[in-house]
Amino acid sequence: MKVILLDSIDKVGKIGSEIIVKSGYARNFLFPKSKAVLSTKKNLAIFKKQQHILKSNLDSKRLKAEFRAKAINDLGSITITVKSSIHGKLFGSIGSRDIAKLITESVGFEVHKSQIRLPNRDALKSIGEHNVCIHVYNEIYANLTVHILNSVLFQDKSKKS
């Protein structure tokens, strides 16, 4: 099925591209989310007229994304305290959902778990520093350091005082 993209989509195409996709992908994803329209002469003419509006919308989304990436980069790092073994292995793990929740609380805007890129595409399972990448928008990324500390150490120190 031939469609015209109304938004840039990773690994598919940029705004205004006329591409061929499977009909199920178009019907179930692109059309309901208003990311594409069926490629016809009439739709091509309408798209040409509205192209500058779509470009300005895309530019405003890009500016928002750059602002969000800067806010996350300015945050620099977040600290998580969890229980762990003597050897530094966590009882459980820290996943993208946990990190997204902490970032959302810290910066004041929503960061979805699907935007978090963990090292080795696996949950964090040990104490220490871990570098995490956040995919904010198409080619805009932010970097963050996650410090994982043992909560038992902090409780023992507070009991002795």
UniProtKB/Swiss-Prot annotation:
A Gene Ontology molecular function term of the record: structural constituent of ribosome
Presence of keyword Endoplasmic reticulum: no
InterPro entries: Ribosomal_bL9, Ribosomal_bL9/RNase_H1_N, Ribosomal_bL9_bac/chp, Ribosomal_bL9_C, Ribosomal_bL9_C_sf, Ribosomal_bL9_N, Ribosomal_bL9_N_sf
Residue ranges of coiled coil: none
GO biological process entries: translation
Family, as annotated: Belongs to the bacterial ribosomal protein bL9 family.
Protein name per the record: Large ribosomal subunit protein bL9
Species this chain originates from: Blochmanniella floridana
